[in-house]
Amino acid sequence: MAVPKKKTSKAKRDQRRAHWRRQASSQAQKALSLGKSILSGRSTFLYPPAEEEGEEE
């Protein structure tokens, strides 16, 4: 017969959510910082700028 699983405690749930939010906040901060750097023109970006594909000779 099927038995329901134990309920996850509120503390464990809140701990997981806090971790996810902390990770998301960190990634958002990095993305915002990179965007500001690119827009201000003082970036040392890792990827080369996109080249036009039709300019091959």
Curated annotation (Swiss-Prot):
One of its GO terms (biological process) is translation. GO terms for molecular function: structural constituent of ribosome. Keywords: Ribonucleoprotein, Ribosomal protein. It holds the Pfam family Ribosomal_L32p. Residues 1-22 have a biased composition (Basic residues). Residues 1-35 are annotated as: Disordered. It comes from the Bacteria. One of its GO terms (cellular component) is large ribosomal subunit. Belongs to the bacterial ribosomal protein bL32 family. This is Large ribosomal subunit protein bL32. It comes from Synechocystis sp. (strain ATCC 27184 / PCC 6803 / Kazusa).
